[in-house]
């Protein structure tokens, strides 16, 4: 393992909660509905993050817990039953309904697992109910997907068929390109989890080889292991380097020669490196500080240092699963400072002291830092954007070069006015 400088911090933190993952999960599975059991704040968060007006009837909603529910003056279970009945009658196309816990529902100990069991009996054969927690007490925003996928694993049937299972939500067009690459090298049975329809869950078993597309799925990996799946450990498919090593790791698990892989991906890699050049010219030598939020930080740091030649000041991450991240850590330069957890005030002090050219952070910190003259990039954009794969390397780099270019233009215009 690379001799990185590991540190751990505890204290006040500034991150989105796991409810935010509903935004990309509901797009991935259009036959599913996500019902948050929470407060008006929860409802505002999801609606704002998704950019969808409520009259557009999106595939998510909030069962509002009022003050009387929180005070124990009303039966929240009865109210939830009523909301679910109304929802199913108005939206008969729903095939899977996720009951999503929040901070308020957990504070009053609302047992959504029992609620889901009862609803499954009542609506058997019509709608399937599962539950998970998106509470900010327990999760950062990407961990909501981990909870949702973990909740689906008990519903997955068993099989002894040999297959490759891509685990983690990615854009449909990215998934199609990955499958095309795997088919070209001789891996023909490739499925994805989560699937494009919630009712089409892949079957799994001892001959299922799992490779992650996202680094924040620790609980999902643990449960897939318990079902007998083999986990393929690899860097994550961000950039040319990460995507190449990711495909090579999958190929090795199926005993496919490296030469065959390179024959297929070499033309893609060459085009991607050429497309990266204009962004590398902007990013080369620039100092980067990554604050913890998404668990993508280590993979992004590897890409931005190794392929875009940025200097890493500090790489923060909410949680660090060393088993899942070992291959990524091995690709980082020695003495890279990695901080697990967060004491936001101390980290902001280090940001100011280090004078970075770019800070990757949450939306709540971005505007204050911009007001201090520090360029920022919202970490949530990495989850909402199709950034995976060799083909997307230049698009990923552009997410970081764009704020630097913008500030350069604004600075030149400001100087021109004097």
Curated annotation (Swiss-Prot):
Domain of life where this protein originates: Bacteria
EC number: 1.3.7.7
Molecular-function GO terms, alphabetical: 4 iron, 4 sulfur cluster binding; ATP binding; metal ion binding; oxidoreductase activity, acting on iron-sulfur proteins as donors; oxidoreductase activity, acting on the CH-CH group of donors, iron-sulfur protein as acceptor
Annotated binding of [4Fe-4S] cluster, by residue: 17, 42, 103
Cofactor(s) needed: [4Fe-4S] cluster
Catalytic activity: chlorophyllide a + oxidized 2[4Fe-4S]-[ferredoxin] + 2 ADP + 2 phosphate = protochlorophyllide a + reduced 2[4Fe-4S]-[ferredoxin] + 2 ATP + 2 H2O
Keywords annotated in UniProt: 4Fe-4S, ATP-binding, Chlorophyll biosynthesis, Iron, Iron-sulfur, Metal-binding, Nucleotide-binding, Oxidoreductase, Photosynthesis
A Pfam family this chain is assigned to: Oxidored_nitro
InterPro entries in the record: LIPOR_BchN/ChlN (IPR050293), Nase/OxRdtase_comp1 (IPR000510), Protochl_reductN (IPR005970)
Pathway assignment: Porphyrin-containing compound metabolism; chlorophyll biosynthesis (light-independent)
Keyword Ligase: no
Gene3D superfamilies per record: Nitrogenase molybdenum iron protein domain
Family: Belongs to the BchN/ChlN family.
Role description: Component of the dark-operative protochlorophyllide reductase (DPOR) that uses Mg-ATP and reduced ferredoxin to reduce ring D of protochlorophyllide (Pchlide) to form chlorophyllide a (Chlide). This reaction is light-independent. The NB-protein (ChlN-ChlB) is the catalytic component of the complex.
NCBIfam families given in the database record: DPOR_bchN, PRK02842.1
Oligomer and partners: Protochlorophyllide reductase is composed of three subunits; ChlL, ChlN and ChlB. Forms a heterotetramer of two ChlB and two ChlN subunits.
Name assigned to this protein: Light-independent protochlorophyllide reductase subunit N
Name of the coding gene: chlN
């Amino acid at each position: 393992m690379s001799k990185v400088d590991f540190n751990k911090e505890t204290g006040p933190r500034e991150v989105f909660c796991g409810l935010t993952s509903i935004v990309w999960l509901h797009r991935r599975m259009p036959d599913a509905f996500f019902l948050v059991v929470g407060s008006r704040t929860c409802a505002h968060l999801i609606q704002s993050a998704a950019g969808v007006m409520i009259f557009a009837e999106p595939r998510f909603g909030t069962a509002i817990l009022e003050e009387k529910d929180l005070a124990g003056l009303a039966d929240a279970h009865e109210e939830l039953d009523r909301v679910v009945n109304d929802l199913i009658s108005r939206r008969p196309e729903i095939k899977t309904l996720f009951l999503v816990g929040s901070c308020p529902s957990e504070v009053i100990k609302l047992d959504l697992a029992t609620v889901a069991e009862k609803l499954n009996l009542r609506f058997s054969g019509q709608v399937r109910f599962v539950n998970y927690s998106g509470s900010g007490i327990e999760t950062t925003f990407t961990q909501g997907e981990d909870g949702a996928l973990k909740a689906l694993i008990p519903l997955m049937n068993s099989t002894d068929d040999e297959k490759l299972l891509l685990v983690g939500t990615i854009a449909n067009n990215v998934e199609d390109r990955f499958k095309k690459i795997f088919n070209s090298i001789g891996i023909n049975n490739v499925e994805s989890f989560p699937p494009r329809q919630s009712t089409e869950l892949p079957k799994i078993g001892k001959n299922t080889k799992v490779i992650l597309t996202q680094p924040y799925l620790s609980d999902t990996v643990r449960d897939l292991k318990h079902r007998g799946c083999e986990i393929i450990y690899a860097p994550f498919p961000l950039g040319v380097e990460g995507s190449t090593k990711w495909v090579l790791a999958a190929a090795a698990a199926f005993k496919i020669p490296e030469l065959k892989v390179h024959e297929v991906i070499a033309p893609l890699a060459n085009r991607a490196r050429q497309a990266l050049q204009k962004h590398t010219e902007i990013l080369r030598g620039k100092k980067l500080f990554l604050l913890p939020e998404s668990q993508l930080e280590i993979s992004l740091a590897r890409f931005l240092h190794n392929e875009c030649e940025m200097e890493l000041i500090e790489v923060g991450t909410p949680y660090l699963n060393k088993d899942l991240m070992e291959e990524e850590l091995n690709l980082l330069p020695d003495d890279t400072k990695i901080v697990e957890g967060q004491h936001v005030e101390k980290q902001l002090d280090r940001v100011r002291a280090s004078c970075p050219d770019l800070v990757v952070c949450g939306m709540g910190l971005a505007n204050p830092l911009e007001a201090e003259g520090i360029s920022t990039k919202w970490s949530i954009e990495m989850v909402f954007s199709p950034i995976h794969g060799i083909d997307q390397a230049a698009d990923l780099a552009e997410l970081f070069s764009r704020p630097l270019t913008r500030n350069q233009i604004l600075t030149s215009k400001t100087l021109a006015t004097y």
